[in-house]
Amino acid sequence: MSQSSSLKRKQQPTISSFFGKTTSSSGESTNKKASLNGLGRAKQRIREEESNLSPSPEDKGEYLDDEDEDIVPPSRKRVKSSRISTDGANAAAKGNDDDLSQSPHRNVPASSRTERFRFQSSPVSSLDAEGSQVEGREAIDTERERKRKENLHQKFVRRLGGPGCLPSLEHGSNANTAMTEGGEDEDEALDEEDVAPPPSTKARGARKAASTKLTPLEKQVIDIKNKHKDAILVVEVGYKFRFFGEDARIAAKELSIVCIPGKLRFDEHPSEAHLNRFASASIPVHRLHVHVKRLVRAGHKVGVVRQLETAALKAAGDNRNAPFERKLTHLYTKGTYIDDTEELEGLNAVGANSAAPATGYLLCMTESNAKGWGNDEKVQVGILAVQPATGNIIHDSFEDGFMRTEIETRLLHIAPCEFLLIGDVSRATDKLVQHLSGSKMNVFGDKVRVERVSKSKTAAAESHSHVSSFYAGRMKATSTTQDERARDLLDKVLNLPEDVTICLSAMIKHLKEYNLENVFDLTKYFQPFSARSHMLLNGNTLINLEIYQNQTEQTSKGSLFWTLDRTKTRFGQRLLRKWVGRPLLDKQELEDRVAAVTELKDSDATPRVGRLKTLLSKVKTDLEKNLLRIYYGKCTRPELLTVLQTLQLIATEFSHVKSPADAGFDSPVINEAISQLPVVLDDVVSYLNKINLHSAKADDKFSFFQESEETDEITEQKLGIGSVEHDLEEYRNTAAEILCKKKVCYVTNAGIEYLIEVENSSLQMKKIPASWRKISGTKKVSRFHPPEVVNLMRERDQHKEALAAACDKAFLGLLADISTKYQPFRDCIQALATLDCFMSLAAVAAQPGYVRPTYADEARISVRGGRHPMVEQLLLDTYVPNDTELGTDGTRALLVTGPNMGGKSSYVRQVALISIMGQIGSYVPAESATLGMLDAVYTRMGAFDNMLAGESTFMVELSETSDILKQATPRSLVILDELGRGTSTHDGVAIAQAVLDYMVRDIRSLTLFITHYQHLSNLARTFPNGELRNVHMKFTESGKDGQDITFLYEVGEGVAHRSYGLNVARLANIPSSVLDVAYTKSAELEEKIKRKNLEGIAKGLSRVLENGENEGELMERLLSEVEQL
């Protein structure tokens, strides 16, 4: 009876197990703890334990002191329990106990535990003595029991009576499992549990301090975070990816996921000492790239931390009880995220209503040798822009003035998604970068990430040495047949300007962090920005003419690029964007491009053009980006299959073309492009023959290669797996003999394989060996794993993990082999992109009202019936065409006047856009057009200030005008809109007249000058050969005093002497009371000016009559004044 009672007590929870912060060794006890989370439940539990621990007559001797309770055997992980000292009464009682324990004649009560340790030679007392001893023992036990209960009560008061007792209970029951890793083995979970804190020495009721001991997982996260403090870490933990600390808060905000509160800082700051775990958030494994893309799109730098060990290999290793080894495997930013076939903006990013397309360029910039100050400041700037997704590299070195117009022009052309600034840049440059990248509504259409790196005083020498060693290492890895090309490559790179070399070195180091430094091997695509083979469109021109995005919504709809974009492929679209921003200057090249567009337009219904259209429509993947992902070794198996099959489709379509003459077109440009397509056919077919198409499509790495192409390592591991599976099949016979059955079959349940199923009611249940482990069961059957099967399954899993590693290694080898063919593959894709652009321009040319332009050698714009290309497509009504005639031999400038909202700005933009379209190689919206080779288009339109630089609207206006006067040439087109309006009338007229005269007389560039100063029309009289003509936008007056006007939007000869600003005020719904006053004041001022002019005319006439000298010149001036009246 005593033994059974003792065993029963061993199964009961002890007081110390409740108050001590212990770790449960089973899920059942953990759940029981978690359920008791209130004061009432805690008290109930104490009462239950008191009743359960009441001593029986046989077992009273077991209850010595509370310090000696040891009824429940310890769990796998011992946790120190708090030892709370008692007050004076308890101390005295304990002293009595000690005295009793030191008594030489103390008799220990018998129990199941102490019975066998009693000395057999103990003297036998008489019955009387024995009876008195029993009574004494009972008295002592009664007193001890009373003290024990009092001690228990004191513990209860100390534990629960203080402030915050309920949170303490809840925390104590749940904190131990807060940071264990889901999906990992039990050993690691136990290792990562918190350890109970040491007992507090504070007064009763003091709040218990949180544990500061870090789990192994937390230590791993902190170590990696310290190396990458600027990145948001996504940590693989079992079957989830988790965020910790501040990263979890940011991820929860950006991804709209739940963040469990906790510590945000990684430096163990005292302000978070009351928290014992990190804040955390989690996402499923299969949604990793979805959420990473969202974080990257928001401008964050994201690091992915993966487990480097698998469960099978870890279980077989020596560190099976250690946490999983983790390492940062990938870093992503907006410019370096190429691990997905879709772009960050999505497949339909460049739709009608989308933002302007991002180019994906990373731009590195350095600045040096600042000279002068104020308006005379000059800086030397070097830039290098890399597009990791395509391999394109742009570099330039130039000097810029205080307005930083050169930097702005390059930034607007390149449209980077990420900046890397080297060293300290000037204040003006820094503010320009902030202005262009600081918000989601900037000119790039999205927020831009900016990173900064330091620059030493010996940066030039260090950069040259670094770049030399980088390319020297590349040259050693090349074959002997490529040595000459490699040397040319190195010479080309080392001859770059010094500041560009500094940028190149910094960019190599930057991209090495993302494993993308191999992009610099592709130096064929190093291109200088400022090559004079293209028309220059500066930053103001790109914005004012809406080349890439409109000025209203900052989207691509309504831009010139949107108008011309009819491409079918993403790589064709990128090439067209480059064409739009860099119109040609070579007349012969331009003629070839337009001839190709004409042939495709005229042959639209022919089979050969239809074949091209069909081919382009079948290309659904971005081959240019996919090819570079192959080059980086980041391509997936299904993606590789798609690339190879698409290239095979392209090459097979024109496999009959052996030379450009076989293509069948008249245009040499088209024939040359088509002849590049079948070149890759043999290589593509050879690679396709190496892989299993069905396995590649299903992303099955184990059977990806054909059997004849598998490596020895793959074959060895497959044989090992086959051997183990054979042994598993053989064990079925052994199992059948054990169970005395004819046949045993394995079953799979809940994903667990090789289970042996036995009916519960059968005789075989009695024959199951004790070593067989029961895995699962139902009322009818039980399922077991014999130890032999478990060992074989473990061996099979190890072979599978080794096989997976061998398959990945072989796949990377295949990607490296394909990378050696990068150049011909890239040429094939580039040729298809060129054909896509030609087809797009042919689709534009096929629209009604578009005509092929004629090109002239001199600077000339002769357009009849021209229309605005974008406004025409957006308007529901018919666009009113206009004529333009400008040339170096005739009229070089037009002074455009007219009422507000009369169409002046639309007209001058129309002229510039037709010129740009013509030099892109496109048809233009006109009845006829003869265009010269313009080297640049400059614009000064709109009014805005630069508060950050302390520059007023008028200052910005004149600064931009100054840059135009310095850069314009006789082959440039210059558009100036209302120059001088930002100051007084007299100063504005003087400045406008001086600038216009300088443009026409000295620079002799083609000029369109918009003004409301009617006095400027007199300047045309100073050019007797008609170099400057006055034109105006026509309108008709109606209503009382001509207050109602109708815009005709036609260009006519002469000057408009009124601007009709009050009519615009009425259209803007200015209150009628204000308009009435404005009309009165306008009439008064107009009458006053007329009287003043009449007085001047009268005095002039009197001088003529009196003197009679210079009569012709004076009379001409008087007639002009009369005409203005």
UniProtKB/Swiss-Prot annotation:
Pfam (any one): MutS_III
Gene3D superfamilies membership: 1.10.1420.10, DNA repair protein MutS, domain I, MutS, connector domain, P-loop containing nucleotide triphosphate hydrolases
GO molecular function: ATP binding; ATP-dependent DNA damage sensor activity; mismatched DNA binding
Chain residue ranges for the region called Mispair-binding domain: 208-335
Complex and partners: Heterodimer consisting of MSH2-MSH3 (MutS beta). Forms a ternary complex with MutL alpha (MLH1-PMS1).
Bias type Basic residues, positions: 146-158
InterPro entries per the UniProt record, alphabetical: DNA_mismatch_repair_MutS-lik_N, DNA_mismatch_repair_MutS/MSH, DNA_mismatch_repair_MutS_C, DNA_mismatch_repair_MutS_core, DNA_mismatch_repair_MutS_N, DNA_mismatch_repair_MutS_sf, MutS, MutS_con_dom_sf
Biased composition (Acidic residues): 182-195
Protein location: Nucleus
Compositional bias ranges of the Low complexity kind: 16-33
Protein encoded by which gene: MSH3
Residues engaged in binding ATP: G898, P899, N900, M901, G902, G903, K904, S905
Identification of the protein by name: DNA mismatch repair protein MSH3
Primary subcellular site in the record, as a coarse category: nucleus
GO biological process, one term: mitotic recombination
